[in-house]
Structure formats: structure tokens, C-alpha cells
Amino acid sequence: MLALDETEINDGAKRWIVSIAKHLNPSSIYVCDGTKEEFDDLASAMVKDGEMIKLNEKNFKNSYLYRSNATDVARTEERTFISARDKSFVGPLNNFLPLDRVKQVWNQFFKGAYTGKTMFVIPYALSSPESKFADFGIEVTDSKYVVLNLHYITRMGKGVIEKIGDRFIKGVHATGNLDPGNKFIIHMPWEKPEGVDADILSVNTNYGGNALLSKKCHALRIASVRAREEGWLAEHMLLLEVKDPQGKSHFITGAFPSASGKTNLAMISPPKDYRDAGWSTRLISDDISWIKIVDGKFMATNPENGFFAVVPGTNYNTNKNAMATLSKNTIFTNVGLTMSGDPWWEGLDPVYDELYDWKGNKRKIGGEPIAHPNSRYTSPLTNYPYLSDLYEDPEGVPVSAILFGGRRATLIPLVFEAFNWNHGVFLGATMGVERTAASEGKVGDLRRDPMAMRPFCGYNINEYFRHWIEIGERSKNKPKIFYVNWFRRRADGTFIWPGFAENFRVLEWIIYRTSHNDNAVETPIGYIPESLNLAGLNISEEDVKELFRIDKEGWKEEMNEIQKYFSELGNVPEEILKEFELEKKRLGY
């Protein structure tokens, strides 16, 4: 760590830090340098103070367990706000906070919030600092946990300090007293109230998505506004490189709401017969992709530098690459702890002795989960065993397919292809998913999550749809758009499709369709495969038919629900309404 007067940080940034410190009133200010020594010192201090637990070094090298407050365990959408002078900027899906209320929050909860504490200053870059995608930010925080997480998920510290100019995103986080009723995560992508010089404010929370301001707050909510203004896309999407047996790389992005298979797909390894035939995969991003249009092509990159991913359900059968990733240099949040000092979560082999649950209670497995359903692991990208050589390419990689997908037990086929760009935008805009533990609310409820951006779009969702339409209008080489659903169930509740590595069979068809017009059957909702490679897969012909069955009556009901949803949104672009009417007509409705 560096004292502020020891750094070579931009004078404008230094002045901002000093002015913020006057309001927060810390006892000291340290600028984070991003070194291993800094990480180790902070981690050791947290362990000494009982704020973190060092895990079994033999099995989980340089890894730790952090337990959050029991009321601070997930993104809190009802306490997440967009502020503007005009409510219409924010739109129907975001929570609006007037500018004068922001000023009240600033004075009530941030004034003196760091009294007696150290103010950590974290300079970070989203995307490689040398990249055309690069965007810079500074987060100030009183939380060592936040500093350690940003060590892993961003490029931060010394290598970034000298590159920060006059334009950077200003984030201020204060742990506060963790009062859920006074939790605020506020974004100001346009104007700010007088005396509040910040783009993002977060208070009375220390949970990842609420406190790691580089992630959803900057890389999606703030960046999505900037992307609209500058003509690019900031998306809640994985980015995967698939290399075919001829050695050609294909790049696929995919938007999936939390717990809908996004991380598992990003980390997919082909089944053995595919590997033997010469197929391979490499990860670029598991969560966020920035896409710029260059010479009519969609060029994508991962703005982040690490993983902050849900861990329950992860094991060597479901995701061996994730297990390799989290075996070292990892911060676990809200998992269980065995008596031997190993982390434990549902999905791992049972432990029959007593262990500690995520709240620190010693007990045996049974009843309430040992690990919180939204427990997480934070690891650097370089932990991943099959990281693409192009993950830091300053030009980005060319996208050939965009996937939309959600967790649906019925109706939605395993895979289908949109008829055209606008139809694909309609499909993404109307994605319906079953609610997960990653956001607060009743698990299992169905809600619309357009492009998996419902919690993350920083402006009016109808303008966001319009932006997608306009991007398509000015792009010569648009990727094809596909919709996938790994979660269709039989009447007895069991999954029809085996999922996980077998999802690669669907990717093979998608890649084929990006450059061919055959092996597809037209249906009222899009093109489905005429045939998939199912060799060696234990699945009945009846199950395959069910995976692709188009239930017209069910779809008519779906269209009624979409109609209600559009009415709630209000000013939906005409192009999407046109696709809606065409879909109804194809369904004979």
C-alpha cells in the first residue's frame, strides 16, 4: 500500500480523493498497489481480527473463508437505484431515486462514515489498460474484504495508477452498520447533486455485488449507459472460444440470468469423443462482455480479470474446471467449513461428522443448507486451466453467435435459432426465467429478465431494446442469435437433457449454423435442428421429441403473458412489437 502523497496518480484523481476524504473523515488514506505483499498483509490482518478464516493450505493454497452478515447475502434489487433529474431516463424496471434524495443519503450515511478507519483507494482498469476497450475507475472503501476481492476480479494497483486520466468512474463504498432498511446502492450515470462527486454510492452493505463496485455497478449499469451513448454494448454475457477440428476459432457470447448455467457453459469442456476428434474450448469471460462494432463486426472482450461465481452444485462431475480454478488463491464467501479446514457446499460429497455452516454454527448436514444458496468463490482468471490466449487481446475477438437462455421447466425447446436480428432481439427482450437465490425474492417465481440485464441495465429498458435494434441496423456482419434452455423437465420433474458437458452437442449445431443454411427445420418460433449429434448419449427418441416439441397452446399462453409484460413496459420499440405480431401469426393466434 502507498500513502497518497507517494503515488503518481493524476492530479485530478488526487484532488477527488482528498475531497471525498474530507466528507468520510478517515484516520488514514492508503492507495492500493495491487501487490501480493499487500494482499497477504490485508488477509493476515483479517484472519488475526477474526474477520476471515485461513483454509487448509494443503488442499486450498492461499485461500480463505469470509462470512458476511446474515442479512447481507445477495444483490438487493429493491435497494438498488438509478438517479436522474428525469424519471423517464430510468425506465420501468429500475428503481428511481431523485437527486435531492441522493444528497440526503450522502449527508446522512456517508458523512463521517470512515471515522477511526482506513480509507482504501483502489485504482482499477476494466479490460486491459492497453486495450481500446479500457475504462478506468477508483473505488474508495473501508472494507478489506472489498480490497481483496478487487485484487482478483480487476486489474488494479501500480500498473493502473499512472494510466488514470481525468475521466474515470468514481465509486464510494461504506460498510456502515449493515441496516437492511438503510441499504443504498446508487448509480448516477448522468448528473449528480451538488456536493456529491461520485458515479456510484454503496452503503450499509458489504456483499459482493453491492460492494464490489467495479463489477455490476460499473461494468454493467454505468457502462451500459456509456455504451448506448458511444454505440457499443455492455452485456451480462459469457464469452467462449470454441476451436473446431480444422483449427478455426469460433467465439460465442451468451446471456443467462444467475443460476441458469452461464458459468458452467463458459467453463465447458467437450465430451471425450469431441476432444478426440479435435474440438477444444477456451474461456474468455464467465459473466460480462463488452462488445464494440469495428468495421461492421462485433468485437468482444472481458472487462474483468477474475471470477465471482456461485459455488453450490459445483463438483468434479458438474464442472471440473471450476473445481481446478477454486483450489488455490480463492476467497470463499458464505460456504461451510469442515473440521479439517476445507470449504464445503451442497454438491460435494457428504460429510458425516459435524461441520460449521455458513453462519458459523457447528452442526451436521440436514435441514437448512450448510452453504448459503448464493455462496461464492472469488478467483483470478489465471487460475482457470483453459484460459484463451486471446483473453487480453486489445482488439477483442469476433463474435459469430449470441445465445440467450434461461431456466424454464417447460415450453422452451433445447435450442432454436432466431429468424433474423430483430426476431432475436424480441426473443432476448422477452426471456422468462425462474427466480434464483442470487437475488432476493421468492425462489421459483417466473419473471421476465430481458437479455439477463433486468437488474443491470443502467437506463430505460425500452431505450436499451432500441439500442440493440439500432446496433443491428448499422452492422454488416451481425452474429446469429440463438435461444437455449438446458432445464426442460419431464412430468415427473426430472431433467430431460443431461446438460453440462453434453451441452457441447448444441454448441456444435450452433457453430454449424453460423456458416450454413441447412440442418434446420422451420417452426413458428424459429429454426430447430433437423438433427443433433447424439452418438453415445443415453436419451430416448421420445425425450428428444419432447425437447423440441412446439406446444402451440402453451405458446399462446406465453404470448398472452408477453402482451401483459409489454403493457407494463410501456414504450416498447415498434420493431419488437412487429416481431411479436409476426410470432402470433405464425402460431395461428
Curated annotation (Swiss-Prot):
Keywords: Cytoplasm, Decarboxylase, Gluconeogenesis, GTP-binding, Lyase, Manganese, Metal-binding, Nucleotide-binding. Transmembrane segments: none annotated. HAMAP family: PEPCK_GTP. Binds 1 Mn(2+) ion per subunit. Pathway: Carbohydrate biosynthesis; gluconeogenesis. One of its GO terms (molecular function) is phosphoenolpyruvate carboxykinase (GTP) activity. Substrate binds at residues 75, 207-209, 258, 374-376. InterPro entries: PEP_carboxykinase_C, PEP_carboxykinase_GTP, PEP_carboxykinase_GTP_C, PEP_carboxykinase_GTP_N, PEP_carboxykinase_N. GO terms for biological process: cellular response to glucose stimulus; gluconeogenesis; glycerol biosynthetic process from pyruvate; oxaloacetate metabolic process; propionate catabolic process; response to lipid; response to starvation. Catalyzes the conversion of oxaloacetate (OAA) to phosphoenolpyruvate (PEP), the rate-limiting step in the metabolic pathway that produces glucose from lactate and other precursors derived from the citric acid cycle. Pfam families: PEPCK_GTP, PEPCK_N. It catalyses: oxaloacetate + GTP = phosphoenolpyruvate + GDP + CO2. Belongs to the phosphoenolpyruvate carboxykinase [GTP] family. It is found in: Cytoplasm. Its cofactor is Mn(2+). Gene3D superfamilies: 3.90.228.20, Phosphoenolpyruvate Carboxykinase, domain 1, Phosphoenolpyruvate Carboxykinase, domain 2. This is Phosphoenolpyruvate carboxykinase [GTP]. GTP binds at residues 259-264, 376, 407, 500-503. The active site is at residue 260. Its EC number is 4.1.1.32. The keyword GTP-binding applies. Mn(2+) binds at residues 216, 236, 287. NCBIfam families: PRK04210.1 (NF003253). The keyword Heme does not apply. One of its GO terms (cellular component) is cytosol.
